[in-house]
Amino acid sequence: MGFLSEYNAKLTSAETAVKCVKSGDWVEYTSNLGFPAACDLALSKRRDELKGVKIRGDLIFGPIQVIECDPEMEHFVYNTWHCSGYERKMCDKGRAFFEPMVFRNLAWYYKNFLTSDVCMVTVSGMDDD
């Protein structure tokens, strides 16, 4: 199987991709422009199926749909490593949490005490070659 065939065989919709998220999972969002907007929207639509899903991201300019759809944070709890203006407003309103960290220690945190169940990453499409 060539790379392009393998790539095409693995393509899926955001709605299908987020079906792997279960209640209580830790979900990682990438930061800044890597924010997985399509998966965030698809996950927010599963709100009533899920409880206590914890999400980590940082410097996401917003809006973040899992925050917007669940003001009481019964279904989704969003945590940010570093606040964008939008995330700071959400933290100030009690709708998100700030988790201070030092970037150089992040790999150590995951190696020694953090766990993740799902990671959502925005990537570019493959080259035609």
Task: Please report, for each region that a protein language model flagged, where it lies by residue.
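Conserved alpha/beta enzyme-core scaffold
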Residues: 1-129
